[in-house]
């Protein structure tokens, strides 16, 4: 109730929130209307500004994107993008810094991702939030709150988020490759192989990291150098 009252107060300065009030999602997975769901998500996220604001805006785009599918259920395709748009429109009124807008954009835009507790999935989500450790934890916080605000059947999904976040923490602790900067090869190594200095180096490093992230090559120095040589020959 407290969160819902706060949201109602916020509607005076964030008009897009009014459209969520009483908006039926027409889907058994969602036991609340969009307004009630948003209030539940706000209440079920940790009390720090980034994730609380993200919770407030994360579904603001649902009324804009709503449609009834062939299954006679409600669907909101690409609603996170519409939600980001509403956040950007309100940013000036709310005096969000450019950094806050940037961080909110990423957390809202990708909150519907479904990470699995696998290294491949963790690397993917970490890349989506631009290899920012704080944003990885923030998006996990929002995902948990979002799940709790959807249905009482969300326990399994929350367990997966927790497991993925635990795996991320363990990968950090073990110094595993989570971003291009973590690769056991660098620009100097690639130049020594004959890669031209300049943007080509960054492109090859990105390709090497993609290969590691997709588990196409082991994150080991010699294996990566061999792959870089193949890139140069192709």
List PLM regions with ranges.
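Short, small-residue-biased leader/transition segments that mark boundaries at the very start
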Residues: 1-7
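Charged substrate- and nucleic-acid-binding regions of tRNA-handling and nucleotidyl-transfer enzymes
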Residues: 89-93, 150-234
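Residue-level recognition of specific faces of alpha-helices
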Residues: 16, 138-141, 189
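Short, well-structured alpha-helical segments
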Residues: 14, 101-109, 201-206
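Short acidic alpha-helix initiation/capping motifs at coil-to-helix transition points
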Residues: 30-33, 78-85, 116-117, 178-186, ...
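Active-site flanking loop/helix segments enriched in acidic
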Residues: 14-40, 61-73
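Divalent metal-dependent catalytic cores for phosphoryl transfer on phosphate-bearing substrates
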Residues: 39-162
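Core structural elements
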Residues: 11-12, 113, 184, 195
